[in-house]
Amino acid sequence: MDQSTHLTWRFLFTGQSPVNFWRQWQDFDLDNNLAVSLQATTRDLQTASQALAWFFRAVVTAPSTMRKQCINAFGVSPQAGDIWIVHGDTLSTLLGSIWAKRNGGIIAHIEAGLRSKYIFRPFPEEINRRLVSRLASLHFPQDEVARLNLVSQSVKGDVIPTHGNTLYDALEVLRDSNWGEPLPDSPFVVANIHRNENLSSTDRWECILETLCLAAQEQPVYLVMHPPTELKLKMDSAAHQRLAKAGVITLPRVTFRRFIQLINKSRYVISDGGSNQEECAYLGKPCLILREESERVEGLNESCLLSKFIPEKIHQFLASPESYARSKTIFSKTPSSIVVGGLQDAYAKRGTA
């Protein structure tokens, strides 16, 4: 939020993905003095065991230790009644909510209300969502389905629909950015595969490999590597060789700014990520979603095709990806402006705005 909102903010970083976090922070030219890492980590987590060890170290951090770190970084410490903003459904979302409760904070959850039908799928995201909804008292669902999920759960506090994801505002900020090495003029495809349920399933992994190889028959496919995917291909050298032989080019994980440039210039996107689904929906970019189900409604049956790993659907998309192209989304009132308004109202009710 900018200075015109009259809300003072600080960013507490959990340490889950330090490399990627600071890259994104720099993408938006944010002041490093406004962020502090509460867990000393130097690399993005790759394995479930690493994530588990990090989470339990972080969750037992004493409030007094956290307050001391904040005073050293910002000159102030968390106060009872402060609003703590958490976003999404990661372990960091849950961790931030726990920290907020321990410090007497009010939890505002952005991207609230997303639900699957299964508590362990996706794991641990679905569990994180449900727990955070019980802890939060300000809920910002991005669509009507998410809002109704919160209503049916009888969550406490205010439910404030944003009618879209705040990711839209991030895309708008970077819309005209021109940064980095020039991109190819010839057609190419961007792929982004990283979900645990896909990397750990033999059948799904084979379907993903086959899909990427089929796409590469017509144009180069740039597979952007997440830490879990990189580890998977190191362990499965035959798959790595198969992709390389087919014309799939692996790229080191790039910054958010660069990734959006790649999406914008690409012919289409292949992904198993919910955020990528939203990005493509807002940009009007064709996207083949390699998942069984998606909790998000953005772009479905429009620019985004949910494959459910059905070969006929995958072939249908690959045969005519341009038929899924749509116009870019335009909001009259952006999701982030709605969130900021909700925060201002919450502070006003508290008597401190």
Where does each model-flagged region fall?
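Nucleotide-activated sugar donor-binding and catalytic core shared by glycosyltransferases
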Residues: 1-221, 229-353
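Conserved C-terminal portion of the radical SAM core fold
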Residues: 226
